[in-house]
Design a protein with these regions (language model features):
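STAS-typified acidic loop motif
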Residues: 1-30, 48-50
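Amphipathic alpha-helical interaction surfaces in cytosolic regulatory modules
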Residues: 22-94
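Juxta-kinase regulatory segment immediately upstream of eukaryotic protein kinase catalytic domains
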Residues: 100-106
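ATP-binding pocket architecture of kinase catalytic cores
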Residues: 109-215, 251
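An alpha-helical support segment within catalytic cores of ATP-dependent transferases
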Residues: 209-259, 263, 269
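Activation of the activation-loop gatekeeper triad in protein kinase-fold domains
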Residues: 277-281
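Active-site activation/catalytic loop segments of kinase-like enzymes and analogous catalytic loops
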Residues: 290-334, 348-364
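ATP/Mg2+ or Mg2+-diphosphate-binding catalytic cores
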Residues: 337, 352-390
Length: 390
């Protein structure tokens, strides 16, 4: 029997390995409480990933721990051990989570990645999405709930049917037969983006055609106002006030939006586009969606074009071209002046978000250049744009 621990933010994970029975329960208790005392103020979670067996003596140790930790949780519990907890009533007293099946991405085809994870083809019928954060379970559960909501609302989306362990983190499994991402379509034919753009915009329009109830998803206007309030002290006073006033003047809309709409997040199956990443669902005026799209294709990689290559696998020039084609398709016009006018409105949202992000990461080597660029562009755009609506 071994007892080890690790700390992640405010959580103290105590791992118990092997068998805990009458012969070593006292020793296990001594080690567990010593770790707890040495790390005060932490929420205790028992990690049973390698716990093979627990007897009544071991259960009494958990009862004593629970008296001091009313919110005690036990995770990664094997089937046989879970049966013991269930039969003895512990599942009614303590939050106990079963162990998830283990999968590996070794040898799997890489499809795409986003801010929070990466997507792989596990086999001909299965897509595996991995999450970068070790404590991604709440995020995964929220994304599954968002996917369910979107599906009920009529959006063609892939709903994960299983949670798995991938290394030290988690993943979700989705059945997607013969599917490829819009990113792959672009990489395969960067000289003709028409097919990829049609899938991309058809899906976007289907999302924006849906109205949701207040409180069903976050309101993006409120989020954007928070961005403006954060960056305003770093701008000339008149610019900071105008930025907030422009966002404040955007009328409330209950239009459903994706919130992170880029080509890695759309798959094509049997000639139909479908979404695979749903953790950023929100609502509001489409200018907020277009702002995030501008960042995804141009803003985030404006000062370093290799960012586009690393994220999508196609060039920054291709991303710029795709943004232009997609915007025209979304607006339903080839008029350059109309499209530029709307693009500038979206850019104000995009640069505001990027400026906040860079200001919050002052120690990153790229931040000073990003801050300077965002300020420069916001000054230019705020002198030209008098409304964000279109």
């Amino acid at each position: 029997m071994e007892v080890t621990y690790r700390i992640d933010k405010d959580i103290l994970y105590i791992a118990v390995e092997g068998r805990v029975d009458a012969s070593n329960a006292a020793q296990a208790e001594e080690k567990i409480f010593a770790i707890k005392i040495a790390n005060p103020g932490k929420h205790v979670v028992l990690d049973a990933d390698r716990l093979e067996y627990i007897s009544s003596a071991g259960l009494r140790v958990i009862l004593r721990l629970r008296k001091e930790e009313p919110k005690l949780a036990i995770i990664n519990v094997a089937f046989d051990v879970y049966e013991v907890f269930d039969m003895t009533g512990f599942t009614d007293m303590v939050t106990i989570e079963k162990a998830y099946p283990k999968m590996s991405v070794e040898g799997c085809e890489f499809i795409a990645k986003g801010a929070n994870g990466a997507v792989y083809r596990y086999d001909a019928e299965t897509i595996l999405k991995t999450y970068f954060a070790k404590d991604a379970l709440p995020e995964i559960k929220q994304e599954r709930e968002n996917a369910r909501k979107a599906f009920v609302l009529g959006i063609n989306t892939a709903i994960p049917y299983g949670i798995v362990r991938v290394g030290d983190s988690y993943g979700t499994v989705t059945e997607l037969l013969n599917a490829e991402s819009v990113t792959q379509l672009i990489r395969n034919n960067p000289n003709d983006l028409s097919v990829a753009a049609k899938y991309y915009i058809d899906m976007l329009k289907s999302i924006h055609a849906i109205e949701v109830e207040d409180g069903e998803v976050p309101d993006m206007k409120e989020t954007a106002l928070a961005w403006a309030d954060f960056v305003a002290p770093h701008l000339p006073e008149a610019q900071g006030k105008k930025l907030r006033a422009l966002i404040e003047a955007v009328p409330k809309r209950n239009t459903l939006m994706h919130g992170d709409y880029h080509t890695n997040n759309i798959m094509v199956q049997n000639g139909e586009p479908l979404l695979i990443d749903m953790d950023t669902l929100c609502m509001g005026h489409p200018v907020f969606e277009l702002g995030s799209m501008f960042n995804a294709f141009i803003g985030y990689s404006e000062l370093d074009h290799q960012v586009t290559v690393n994220f999508y696998g196609y060039s920054h020039e291709t991303a710029e071209k795709f943004w232009d084609i997609a915007l025209k398709a979304y607006l339903g016009t080839e008029d350059e002046s109309v499209c530029q006018n709307v693009a500038e409105k979206a850019m104000i949202i995009g640069y505001t978000r990027m400026l906040r992000r860079a200001l919050r990461r002052p120690n990153e080597p790229e931040s000073p250049a990003k801050i300077a660029r965002c300020k420069e562009m916001l000054e230019l755009l705020l002198n030209k744009v008098d409304a964000l609506t279109f």
